[in-house]
Amino acid sequence: MAAAVTEAQMEKKLIEQLTQGANQWRLREDLKTIPQLWANFFQILEDNNRDQLHDVPLTPNEKETISTQITQSNFYKAAKFLAGANRQVRQHLKRDDSSLPDADLLILDNTNIAGGTSVYEVVHQVEVNKSSLSALDQDRRFDVTLLINGLPVIQIELKTPNFPFMDAFRQIQKYIDEDKFGNIYNFVEMLVVTNGTDTRYIPAGSTLNANFLITWIDQNKQPVNEYLEFAREVLSIPMAHHMIADYTVLDDNAQRIILLRPYQIQAILAIFRASREGKSGFVWHATGSGKTLTSYKVARNLLQIPAIDKTIFLIDRKDLDMQTVTAFQTYANNDTIDVDETANSFELAQQLGDGNRNVLVTTRQKLQAIFKRMENSPTIAKKYQKLKNLRLAFIVDECHRAVTPTQKRELDRFFNRQPLWYGFTGTPIFAENARAEKGQEARTTEQLYGPVLHKYTIEDAIHDHKVLGFKINNEGDFNQTDNDAIYLTDMHMKAVVQQTLLLAYRTQGLSNGHRYSALFSTSSIKQAQKYYHLFQETIAKGEVPKRIQKVAPDFPRIAITYSISQNEEESMANQAEMKQALADYNKMFHTQFSMSELGSYNRNVNDRLACKNKTYQTHDQQLDIVIVVDRLLTGFDAPRLSTLYLDRSPMNPQNLIQAFSRTNRIYDLGKKWGQIVTFQYPDQYSAAIDKALTLYANGGTNGVLAPDWNTSRQRYLQSRQQLDNYIKNPKVLETLIDAPQKEQKQFAKAFQAYDQALAAIKTYDELDKQDQLPAAEQINLEDISPELESTLEGKYQTIIDKLKADRKNDDKSTDLNIDEDYKMESIHMKEVDEFYIMSLIRNYIATANQSGQQVNVTQESPAPDEKLQVGDYIAQYAKTNEPRAKHIRFIWNDVQQDPQKYSHQRVEEVLENSIKQESQQVLIQLADDFGLDYDKLQYVMDNYDLDNSNPKGMENLVSRRYFDRFKEEHPNTQFQNFLDWKGQVRRQVKKVYETQIRPLTTEIS
């Protein structure tokens, strides 16, 4: 039997691969410490800047000045510094010798990748010393680091194949938490983790998320997992330098680094090749796969081609407030890109003719306005004549909505030199679904833009876990193709409202303790208004299903949005309806929108539906169902949105897939599918869906649509049968912990399969129609008691812990692959959320204090047995959030002693006041420990974001004046210099936020 490979052997092979060939990485065995890395950096800096330095070496003081000025406090700031300007990173230096002129030092030159002044080196086992501030800290060694011009930019951590690659991931996170990536290592932008057989990469950040680990995919769509093959494909020169210089984006809002995925990079390269040949084309990337990010980098990178004067990201005017443009602006804030927010075409014309090679984001309408002004005025035409000679590249996101064939032809005719066009779409138009014939106008995407340059379909995105598949439920009863009137009757619409609320229990996640949102799309504004009233009437009458009221008493929170013209006489009725809808909305959310603020109202609806803003991440600030006609069915990104209800006839293939794609963003473990429910023409919908998926999913529905009920049921029964081998043999279950490893793996695999199958089948509404099914097709999900389930889970978790601890003795005689990082998908979904617990307590108070008051019978209140369960629910909730559960437990005990005391109080306010008091005490203590300003500390905590490496308000909090005051008051403090104090404050603030403030102030559901 061959000896197991060691990390040292893997490291040696990796370095051999990296240094193989000409112009690759050069091994530097002499660099083993941070001071040695700095010395090497300065040597390269001097070599590359002899002219600027006038051959006078840098003095120690000058080196100290430079290192202080360029060293940043976190990965994001360091990456921002390395972004430089015009693809070069420079640092100004005033020389110590006043007789020497100031130097403009070139640190990194991304215009000369694999040439010029670029120096590529690899080091390994660099020592990073422990902090003097922590007795528990220890020295560390980094496995392999790649340096460009002396700066560490890519860090590789290795584990041997008998350990999961996630151990390398966790090790890097541990080093980050220990501040080992400070100093010169803050320049790292890309992290690579591998166990030899599985390799992933991820952008550097203060808090790493395993969901963002990326597998490299080659041109043939095959994963590259083996670490030496990954090194050849990704870490060789020039590719590694391109990853840092060209395939990295800085998100200004989230203050984080983004690394592009393989398919995005391949699309950029395809466009780059086409543009060098003067060819146009389009990119077909599935909705939800990051088209905007890809198109942004395309727009930026095209400027590397000298023949292109400017690139223009072209949008339609009505898309200006869309998420696409907002995202583009956040990426552009750290780049040389001008986002056109000019009020008129005059300013745009000036920007076009200013001679700067940059990217403009503008609207088609403003460009057309320039043309018209030139046509109507010879003076203006002469002034802007040079615009006609520009060589432009147009980037068009959602390319069919932004530009029609007629509009594109008009733009082409204006310029003397044919512009290049690159369209991005998730739903290309083919011959099968071509536009209506109109003379010689382009009818397909290829005719309009040119050939497809890169393709990444829905099927690809689902396979890569970028988006979810779809679960289709055709509820319509009629198939009359010529009788739309049937679907406009009161009988049909009332039945649809009732059925929507019945289905919402599962489609919107309420059955599993979640609460996802939905869009409800109709064929007309009038129909949408009628549905809005029907939903409101149903809510007012208390006709929402009891099981929904039990878990979400205020479900559904409804809104409606549609376009209104102030000038059209026929829109008066629509305005009246919208006024009522605004009044309802203002009452529900305590807002004050008027008819003159419809734009703001629509944005607010979008924000509450998207739930990306911190303000809208609690249930009481969110919407459950938004009624629309066509609005929000394209270009809207809301990961929490799970369901699309359609009471309209089937749309064309491209619009159908666009609409469906609102539902299939990945959100959490409970969201298994994008749920689609149709209420009209079921046969036509089935045919339309098949046609759409044939066009957009590589010719079929496999892997894109959820399995039908019988398939999912069979999978559940098979998994249950495997688990029954243990349930029906208690002795086997009891002895599992001491059983051979092979038997333990078999149980773990069976338990994971059962959990997955159970989570999947809970999404089917057939579970609620079991009495309508033949006895042979019925299943019972309740025959495993909570006690037995807890026992099974306990055994499973113990076995997983044992397997992790005993990897060196792993039994390789079995092919059973156990996912040791598997997260329960169904078992833990039975947890009751805080909202439900508080509603039970609230209704208990109302019941106990009836004394002549009528209790609201439509709401749930604890029955005698349920009253006993409230304590159990609180204990269950404590597993996910003990700090908040502690306060709820105290209130519940107090309520039972004296319910009258709470008769005129909202228990939610009592809870928040109690939590606020504890939070204040925690912050007062933290402020006292470090001499911090309490108000500034409160501001930092209120705005803290773990994904943001530079929390808002932190720089003001750690001001030197507070350190000076602290040291004056505590002369014997361990913090004798400002930087030590500042670093410890940042660490403690993060720790207190993570372990105390966030759990206290965040409702876990």
Describe the role of every protein-language-model region.
Residues 283-284, 309-317, 516-524:
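Conserved RecA-like ASCE P-loop NTPase motor core of nucleic-acid helicases/translocases
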Residues 165-168, 204, 365-484, 493-494, ...:
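Signature of the SF2 helicase/ATPase Hel1-core->accessory helical subdomain module
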Residues 332-375:
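Inter-Walker segment of RecA-like/P-loop motor cores
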Residues 181, 368, 393-394, 401, ...:
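Conserved RecA-like P-loop NTPase helicase motor core
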Residues 484-625:
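Conserved C-terminal RecA-like helicase domain
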Residues 318-344, 537-544:
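Conserved helix-turn-beta segment of the N-terminal RecA-like "Helicase ATP-binding" lobe
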Residues 16-17, 23-25, 37, 46-49, ...:
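Catalytic cores and motor modules of nucleic-acid processing enzymes
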Residues 2-26, 30-310, 319, 323-335, ...:
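ATP-dependent helicase/translocase motor core
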